[in-house]
Amino acid sequence: MSKIIGIDLGTTNSAVAVLEGTESKIIANPEGNRTTPSVVSFKNGEIIVGDAAKRQAVTNPDTIISIKSKMGTSEKVAANGKEYTPQEISAMILQYLKGYAEEYLGEKVTKAVITVPAYFNDAQRQATKDAGKIAGLEVERIVNEPTAAALAYGLDKQDKEEKILVFDLGGGTFDVSILELGDGVFDVLATAGDNKLGGDDFDQKIIDHMVAEFKKENGIDLSNDKMALQRLKDAAEKAKKDLSGVTSTQISLPFITAGDAGPLHLEMTLTRAKFDDLTRDLVERTKEPVRRALSDAGLSLSEIDEVILVGGSTRIPAVVEAVKAETGKEPNKSVNPDEVVAMGAAIQGGVITGDVKDVVLLDVTPLSLGIETMGGVFTKLIDRNTTIPTSKSQVFSTAADNQPAVDIHVLQGERPMAADNKTLGRFQLTDIPAAPRGIPQIEVTFDIDKNGIVSVKAKDLGTQKEQHIVIQSNSGLTDEEIDRMMKDAEANAEADKKRKEEVDLRNEVDQAIFATEKTIKETEGKGFDAERNAAQAALDELKKAQEDNNLDDMKAKLEALNEKAQALAVKLYEQAAAAQQAQAGAEGAENAGSTKADDDVVDGEFTEK
């Protein structure tokens, strides 16, 4: 069975891992980094992903960041003169990760386990699965990020039972999960979170502070300047990271804008104390989900054995202190917060292929599911933190006499009124026989699969008529749209491949021209006129093809030049070898003469007096 890669598709950074033997290994990207920025930019028709895209974010307006925050919505992003769905942009990131995983493995990759925040709703999970499909990946499993982290942490600790709390604060989302580990079973007891809280929010607090201070000093509002804002974002992210290791950092942005008197520079010092003050409300928001998860799991703090920190934002000292204060425990530092989720996803891939034995993952649904009933009430069928996969049925009836149809409004959330929860979808069961209200029996069944994706059916128990849908929110893509996007992605991949081949060819041509010119110069006056002239003629022809920008001609002329240059190099080598041999012969004769002279030397004894 082919390898199943594990992918952590993050808001700010992503990572890919694979199982090698019994160990999960992070695959470094082409730049040698173990995580890849979740950034996509477009330039001259080319799609650029990762570190290169992030580097040009300041100057390239066609750069898209933090697309994960838009997953599951109908919002589109404009770039490159087009509009893209969040699924398409995410697919470009996935395609890049898939590409360098294939380079590393030396084989085609078609299957993946992709992680999502535990608190992602159905629409967001479906969007993630669609992104995988567009990227040419069969998504074998969607796994919650804290659960994946627990897998990576606990794989070598199966001999002991323990309850762990996973505190996962990433770039754009926050989750808390409580799991029970023992005998190879990873049982999620409860999960809670906030999909609108992450490292980006901490960056924004610094940006707002810089904008306010600059306006106070110079009377100019930088928040209206797109290029200045991107520079502020980069500086804020760097300052945040610096303050994890030092208590004060200098922010210096020369020529940030211009005033009446000329260019203006932003220079300021940010202390950790000020940063903590700016972000106090964000840190405070992490506490309630911890308490809720513990309450839902029916556990007290004393029953938690370990606290695992996941996500780059857990390096913020104030966050670490808040976790300590809230749990009364020193967090476990045995896992890398940036890599552990992808590693856990790869382990789940190994469970699916059978490479990892005796491991069972029991995850939960993060939010309650139900339907709208009379009076706009939200009636739950499946409570949050129910182990998945699961199925639940309940019988309802009509609200009016002779009602011919019922509308099924499917919702996800925790609020008592339907209007306050997230709509997953609507469908209708028709042709209900005329009867007084309350008589027809309509059975509604919810199914949640192992990926947390919902399907619902409604059945008239009198007529046995049934209506069934897999939930597709207004942000969902049709099969036709996914197919079209897959074709676009394949075409882009082919175009990228051609572009790379073209760049490689141009580099080879430049290298060949340089090397041949050097060899021709070195062989001047050494008697290889025929070979030198042939190499020079081939060199001139290649230069002409280069000027004409004819790629096919360049390829043919490059081969011809390599052949002539090689013939010249052989002559040069032969001459050097002959000279070396002659020199060795001369030295041998000289040494022989020296030995003969040595025969006249008489040995004597030396006595110390």
From Swiss-Prot:
PROSITE patterns: HSP70_1, HSP70_2, HSP70_3. InterPro entries: ATPase_NBD, Chaperone_DnaK, Heat_shock_70_CS, HSP70_C_sf, HSP70_peptide-bd_sf, Hsp_70_fam. Coiled coil: none annotated. SUPFAM superfamilies: Actin-like ATPase domain, Heat shock protein 70kD (HSP70), C-terminal subdomain, Heat shock protein 70kD (HSP70), peptide-binding domain. Transmembrane segments: none annotated. Belongs to the heat shock protein 70 family. Residues 576-593 have a biased composition (Low complexity). Acts as a chaperone. Residues 600-609 have a biased composition (Acidic residues). The modification Phosphothreonine is found at residue 173. Keywords: ATP-binding, Chaperone, Nucleotide-binding, Phosphoprotein, Stress response. Induction: By stress conditions e.g. heat shock. Signal peptide: none annotated. GO terms for molecular function: ATP binding; ATP-dependent protein folding chaperone; unfolded protein binding. This is Chaperone protein DnaK. Residues 576-609 are annotated as: Disordered. It comes from the Bacteria.
